[in-house]
A protein has these predicted regions:
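Alpha-helical scaffold elements adjacent to nucleotide-binding pockets in ATP/GTP-utilizing enzyme cores
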Residues: 3, 7, 94-97, 125-132, ...
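Conserved helicase NTPase motor core
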Residues: 8, 25-128, 140-147
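Proline-centered turn/helix-capping motifs that create local helix->coil transitions or kinks
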Residues: 12-18, 103, 158-168
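Short linear capping/connector segments at secondary-structure termini
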Residues: 19-24, 75-78, 111-112, 171-179
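Helicase P-loop NTPase motor core
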Residues: 134-138, 142-200
Length: 200
């Protein structure tokens, strides 16, 4: 059941209904599509929607109703999206429908903080935005107020190995702070014991 839940949610995040999914004669994929279809029919009969369905229905509504889309394009002349690194394909499509024509779009995001890929977030949306929108200005917020220099230096060194990022160099006016130490826990209980001991 959990695997099917992720499958259905993932397909909706991509803007795909069961009839849009190509199975390529893969029996597993065909089974998943049938379950997706049955799930959607059951939801429709019961008058229920999941979160991904809310997003997809709004997207389809705008795609299939140019008059309504124009109304919202005129109503929302400026669009701001925060935590942009956590957007999925349908949410990116929303942004394109609402804001691309006017070009008055501002996104705020950190491509080094994308942690919701398992939930459909596509870090590629940041790169897409910078290539698909005209006159994009990137403002890097690199000064950090929370961490010490030692932590930031280690983080910068580690994340620099990721070649699929826009790039930035975090810095702080704070002092170097404690040196970083590494503890390898045997399991989650050992990890919890170590952390609680350090906190005391």
């Amino acid at each position: 059941p959990k695997q099917m839940q992720w499958y259905i949610n993932g397909k909706k995040d991509e803007g795909l209904r069961p009839q849009h999914i190509e199975t390529y004669d893969d029996q597993t994929e065909e089974t998943f599509v049938k379950v997706y279809q049955a799930y959607q029919e059951a939801c429709d009969r019961a008058g229920l929607v999941d979160f991904a369905e809310l997003l997809l229905r709004a997207h389809e509504l705008w795609l299939n109703n140019p008059v309504l889309l124009k109304h919202y394009q005129q109503r929302f002349t400026h669009v701001l999206v925060d935590e942009f690194q956590d957007t999925n394909s349908v949410q990116y499509a929303w942004l394109t429908l609402l804001g691309k024509e006017s070009g008055k779009v501002m996104i705020v995001g950190d491509d080094d903080q994308s942690i919701y890929g398992w939930r459909g977030a596509k870090i590629e949306n940041i790169q897409r935005f910078t290539s698909e929108y005209e006159q994009v200005e990137t403002i890097r917020l690199e000064q950090n107020y929370r961490s010490t220099a030692n932590i930031l230096n280690a983080a910068n060194k580690l994340i620099s190995n990721n070649n699929n990022r826009l790039g930035k160099e975090l810095w702080t006016q704070d002092d170097a702070g404690e040196k970083i130490s590494i503890y390898t826990a045997f399991n989650e209980i050992d990890e919890a014991r170590f952390i609680s001991g350090r906190i005391k």
